[in-house]
């Protein structure tokens, strides 16, 4: 939404694919019986910066690093300054604090991004790509979501991106090569063996309420979409990796249904199939990096 307002015609599903957030898996909360697992191996805020750079954009960004003192007046002034040039992307936000979403109580600790288009003395005005346009929220009420205290996989709090200016126009081949390198790097830096361990835990212990809320309302359906978008992006460059991603999208869709039915035996089997395909994809990503 923000880039479109600046006059850049880039489809949301294309940008989502380039964020590369549907690969691998990460344990975000350790627990022998009920670990909390996200189906990605990257940080979403860093992914936004990567996408902008890969596509040839110059931009301004701000975030408050760990241990830095919080100065809300400074943060507000920074946002106001960026808004003078156009909409600003904010996030990661904790969806549990976005009260305009009727499902927000099921989404604490889940990251999200929005496009802010105005700020006055009391209110923030934003478009949420989850289907909530023209939302008006008191600035003070928005701060807990923006602080994202429950989201560990981020560079910092109060992150924002704005003042977008495309200074280069890399061709499709250059974009593919850059994203391919990022995929390999994330696999090398990410956690390994998460999915087989998770499959075993699900088979033995099932899912607790926290896991069910995450998976039923968010993670499986999002993983399916992310894998499908990446499959489409890869189709003209690497047919094998594209097919694996298409198959993974189908498996994540089936996992969503098994999760809703609370059929944990079937869900465990699906997670093992996902693990096998993701490992194949990982191997191909590392091989492509070395070519």
Can you describe what each PLM-predicted range is?
Residues 1-5, 222-232:
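Short, hydrophobic/amphipathic alpha-helical patches that form generic packing surfaces
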Residues 1-72:
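Cysteine-nucleophile protease catalytic domains, especially the papain-like/related folds used
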Residues 45-95, 159-174:
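Predominantly the structural core of cysteine protease catalytic domains
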Residues 82-85, 117-123, 240:
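A short, structured loop/turn motif at beta-sheet edges
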Residues 97-101:
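Short, solvent-exposed loop/turn segments at secondary-structure junctions
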Residues 104-131:
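Catalytic nucleophile-His microenvironment captured as a short glycine-rich beta-strand/loop
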Residues 121-225:
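Noncatalytic regulatory segments and standalone regulatory/sensor domains
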Residues 227-291:
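Charged, long alpha-helical assembly modules
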